[in-house]
A protein has these predicted regions:
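Catalytic binding pocket for nucleotide-activated donors in carbohydrate/polymer assembly enzymes
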Residues: 7-11, 21-24, 38-46, 50-57, ...
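Extended catalytic core of nucleotide-activated donor transferases of GT-like folds
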Residues: 7, 19-27, 32, 37-159, ...
C-alpha cells in the first residue's frame, strides 16, 4: 500500500520534536511493505540542520514553502492508498489538510495524525468556526501522538469517526547505550527546545532545582535558551543533534523530562525524549502527569517529581549505583513493551482492519445495487 504523509520534517529535528516519532513509525511501516512518501516544506531553517539524509526506507519530497508549491504536492495525494496529514507542519496547515483530503481518491483512507493533540483540542474548543470542525467527519480516523482516554473522548465529541493514540516509543537501532562523553558530564541534564507553553515548568523543575543545588552540575541543551537567566552551575550547549542524544543520555547522572503545559494537563503523553533516554539506560526524572505508570513504573523505572524542590531532593540523594539500576530497568521495560516495532504493528493492524471493513462495505453496497437492478 502507498502512503502519502504530509508532515513537518522527517530529515531534521531542528525545532521539530516529532522527527524521532515520524522516523520510528515510518521506518517500521516500510519494513512491513508500505511504500511511503513524506512531503515536508523547506521552512524554519530545518534543511540546513538535517540530522539524517533522505533514508532508503522512505522517499522524502522537500518543497518550497509557498502556496503554489504546496498545491503541487497536494495533487500527489491522489497516488496514495492512505493519505496522512500531520498537525504542526507549520506552513499552510489548514489549506494543506483541505487540499490533500480533497485530492485523495474516493477509496483512499484519510488520516489526520495529531502530534500535539491537547493544543489542537484547545484550539478547536476556543474557535467554533475553525475549518477543522467541518472536516473531522470527512476523515476516516484521527491518530494521535498521545493523550490517552481524554483525547479520544474529546475528538469523538467533536465529531471524529475514530480516534486512536499511537504513543511515542523507542527505536533501539537509533537510541541505545554508548560510552560516556565528557562534554555531557553533569548531575542533571535537560534537552528540549524553548517553547512558551513549557517555559514556566522548565523554570520550576530545572532552573529552580539548579538554584537549590549550587554544588551540582546542570546541563541544558536545545534551541532558544541563550538569553534565559541561569544560575552559574547551569551550562548551556545549544541545539544537540540527534546523533549526540545517546551520548548525552548515557553520560548524565540523571536526565530530566518536562512536559508542556497542555500535555501535563491531559496526561498520557510521554515525549520522545523519555524513550530516547530510557533506550540509553538513563535514569529519568520526570514531572508528574497522569498515566506515567502506563509506560514506566515510578520509583523503579523512572523517578517522578511534583516540583523543583522534589527534583533537587531526588538529585541530592541519587547515587551512581541507584541511577544505573533505574536506567537498566527502564531500558528493559521499553525494549519489552515500547518499541516502534510494536507501535508499527498497531498502525499496520489498524490500517488493514479499516481497509477490510471498507472493502466489506463496498461489497455489501454493490450487492444491494445488484439486487435492486434485478428487481
Amino acid at each position: 500500500m502507498k502512503i502519502a504523509f504530509y508532515g513537518s520534517s522527517l530529515v531534521s529535528s531542528y525545532w521539530n520534536g516529532a522527527a524521532t516519532y515520524y522516523r520510528g513509525i515510518i521506518r517500521d511501516l516500510a519494513r512491513r511493505g508500505y511504500d511511503i512518501t513524506f512531503y515536508e516544506p523547506d521552512a524554519y531553517d530545518r534543511q540546513s540542520h538535517r540530522d539524517i539524509e533522505p533514508p532508503d526506507w522512505c522517499r522524502v519530497v522537500v518543497y518550497p514553502a509557498t502556496i503554489e508549491h504546496m498545491k503541487r504536492v497536494v495533487a500527489r495525494a491522489a497516488e496514495a492508498d492512505i493519505v496522512v496529514k500531520a498537525s504542526g507542519v507549520g506552513v499552510f496547515d489548514n489549506e494543506l489538510l483541505d487540499g490533500v483530503m480533497a485530492a485523495a481518491r474516493p477509496d483512499a483512507m484519510r488520516i489526520f495524525w495529531d502530534v500535539d493533540a491537547p493544543a489542537t483540542i484547545a484550539e478547536l474548543r476556543e474557535h467554533p468556526d475553525h475549518p477543522m470542525h467541518a472536516g473531522l467527519a470527512d476523515l476516516d480516523a484521527v491518530l494521535t501522538y498521545g493523550g490517552g482516554p481524554p483525547i479520544v473522548a474529546a475528538y469523538e465529541s467533536l465529531g471524529a469517526r475514530h480516534c486512536r493514540p499511537i504513543y511515542n516509543a523507542l527505536d533501539p537501532d537509533t537510541h541505545h547505550p554508548v560510552a560516556p562523553d565528557e562534554k555531557f558530564r553533569c548531575d542533571l541534564g535537560f534537552l528540549a527546545n524553548r517553547l512558551p507553553d513549557r517555559e514556566r515548568r522548565v523554570e520550576e523543575f530545572f532552573l529552580n532545582a539548579a538554584e537549590q543545588l549550587p554544588d551540582r552540575a546542570f546541563l541544558l541543551g536545545g534551541a532558544g535558551w541563550e538569553d534565559k537567566p541561569k544560575s552559574s552551575n547551569v551550562r548551556y550547549i545549544g541545539h544537540v543533534p540527534t546523533r549526540d542524544h545517546n551520548a548525552f543520555n548515557s553520560t548524565a547522572l540523571a536526565v530530566l523530562n518536562v512536559a508542556r503545559d497542555s500535555m501535563a494537563t491531559i496526561g498520557y503523553s510521554p515525549a520522545t525524549r523519555v524513550f530516547e533516554a530510557a533506550g540509553a539506560a538513563a535514569c529519568i526524572v520526570t514531572d508528574a502527569w497522569e498515566g506515567v505508570g502506563l509506560f514506566l513504573e515510578p520509583g523503579k523505572e523512572i523517578l517522578v517529581a511534583r516540583d523543583g524542590r522534589d527534583v533537587a531532593a531526588l538529585i541530592a540523594e541519587l547515587t551512581p549505583h541507584r541511577a544505573a539500576e533505574i536506567g537498566r530497568r527502564a531500558l528493559a521495560r521499553v525494549l519489552r513493551d515500547h518499541t516502534y516495532a510494536q507501535r508499527g504493528a498497531e498502525v499496520d493492524a489498524f490500517f488493514r482492519k479499516f481497509r477490510e471493513r471498507g472493502q466489506m462495505r463496498e461489497r455489501r453496497e454493490a450487492g444491494r445495487a445488484g439486487a435492486e437492478g434485478v428487481l
